[in-house]
Amino acid sequence: MNNTSKLLNLSNVSYYIGQQRLLSNINIDIAVNETVSVIGPNGAGKSTLVKLILGLIVPTSGQVTPSEPLQIGYVPQRFSVPPILPLRVSDLLAQACKKRLTAEQRQFIFDKLSLTHLLSRQMLHLSGGETQRVLLARALLDKPNLLILDEPMQGLDPETEVWLYQFIDELPEFLRCAMLVVSHDLHWVMKGSRRVICLNKHICCEGQPSELAISSEFQKLFGHHYEQPYVHQPHACEHHAPS
């Protein structure tokens, strides 16, 4: 990878809390418009990696060096609204509308994610799939050049999962941005990713799925569980968000 195509670089990054090692000697380059999937067991440091990239925590050692300017769109693993806080969908999305997109581009996102009928709804009353679509829209409205999806399938019904898998596949062309996808879904990662990083407090292995599948480190962690198929049931509306 040449320097001109590099969007983000993590160089010899380690993170400790006291004597507890959460991440050690992480070296990652993410290129412009590249999609990178991150997998690993519970406690592997995936959430810590995301926090380091977002700048929420500072490495104990090493450097996280973004290109300038770096605009990150982030869809968190969990999102909760206090019951006493009234927050409409339109209010949440308005926070992301910073005039980086044209009105036509914003409307395209609303249509693609089937959001128009949700705008007056309270966030507290949305289903898991509806909440995920709103959070994805909020991230896209910031016109990111790096989109981070942290366990995007968590808590979704099967129909919404199928739609979101396909939408994620289309996002690089739609957005023209890099993506970092943290996922526990080994089957989707191994079948649908071009570059995978296997994390277990350090980088165990990385590369194309076919390369990881024969890696001894990968086999120790996951065996052949990724071969258990995700059943994709095509339906007429799979190109659009479930209503």
From Swiss-Prot:
Q: Which processes are annotated in GO (biological process)?
A: response to zinc ion
Transmembrane helix keyword on record: no
The EC code for this enzyme is 7.2.2.20
Catalysis performed (reactions):
Zn(2+)(out) + ATP(in) + H2O(in) = Zn(2+)(in) + ADP(in) + phosphate(in) + H(+)(in)
Q: Name one GO cellular component term.
A: plasma membrane
Where would you say this protein principally sits, based on its record?
membrane
**GO terms for MF:** ABC-type zinc transporter activity; ATP binding; ATP hydrolysis activity
**Which residues does the annotation say bind ATP?**
G40, P41, N42, G43, A44, G45, K46, S47
Disulfide cross-links: none
Entry's localization field: Cell inner membrane
Q: Which UniProt keywords apply?
A: ATP-binding, Cell inner membrane, Cell membrane, Ion transport, Membrane, Nucleotide-binding, Translocase, Transport, Zinc, Zinc transport
Superkingdom, natural source: Bacteria
Q: Which residues form the ABC transporter domain?
A: 8-225
Protein topology in the membrane: Peripheral membrane protein
Q: How does it assemble?
A: The complex is composed of two ATP-binding proteins (ZnuC), two transmembrane proteins (ZnuB) and a solute-binding protein (ZnuA).
| Job of this protein | Part of the ABC transporter complex ZnuABC involved in zinc import. Responsible for energy coupling to the transport system.
What PANTHER family does this protein's entry cite?
METAL TRANSPORT SYSTEM ATP-BINDING PROTEIN TM_0124-RELATED, ZINC IMPORT ATP-BINDING PROTEIN ZNUC
| Family note | Belongs to the ABC transporter superfamily. Zinc importer (TC 3.A.1.15.5) family.
Name assigned to this protein: Zinc import ATP-binding protein ZnuC
Q: Which organism is it from?
A: Psychrobacter cryohalolentis (strain ATCC BAA-1226 / DSM 17306 / VKM B-2378 / K5)
Q: What is the lineage of its organism?
A: Bacteria, Pseudomonadati, Pseudomonadota, Gammaproteobacteria, Moraxellales
UniProt lists the gene as znuC
